[in-house]
């Protein structure tokens, strides 16, 4: 299973992020390529506690949803609603300058995977408290999902 704990998997994500350009067209969804870069950065900020996000209401218990999203072999569905704080068209960080925003994302990815950690994992709005293993798997899956959205 791919995870950002694995250096090869992390390099794969970094290489694919480098292939994204401001004009890269989405295959589904509403985000632009630049908004996706900011969305991933906001996610990493949330994971590390630098961006506060309210818990999302749901009818499926967080532990069940967490297992389905992180450990089941099913691909993530398209169009799953994001929380407002991570939605660039609502309360997410607005895109500013593409290369600067991408550099920030790279820096956040490095900080996320650095050992020892200089932060504590924050609860996920849909999945609640998670282990480092789950966070690193989710981090890979989230980036992979959006990179597939843009065909890279």
Predicted regions and their residues:
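Globin-like tetrapyrrole-binding proteins
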Residues: 4-7, 17-18, 84-96, 105, ...
């Amino acid at each position: 299973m791919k995870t950002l704990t694995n250096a090869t998997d992390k390099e794969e994500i970094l290489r694919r992020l480098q292939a994204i350009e401001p004009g890269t067209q989405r295959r589904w969804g509403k985000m632009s390529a630049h908004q996706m870069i900011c969305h991933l950065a906001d996610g990493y900020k949330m994971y590390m506690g630098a961006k506060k996000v309210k818990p999302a209401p749901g009818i499926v218990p967080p532990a069940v949803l967490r297992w389905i999203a992180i450990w089941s072999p099913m691909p993530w569905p398209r169009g799953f609603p994001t929380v407002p704080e991570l939605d660039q068209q609502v309360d997410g960080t607005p895109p500013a300058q593409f290369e600067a925003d991408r550099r920030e994302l790279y820096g956040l990815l490095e900080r996320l995977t650095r050992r020892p950690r200089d932060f504590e994992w924050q609860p996920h709005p849909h999945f609640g408290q998670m282990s480092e293993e789950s966070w690193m798997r989710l981090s890979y899956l989230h980036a992979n999902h959006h990179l597939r959205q843009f065909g890279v």
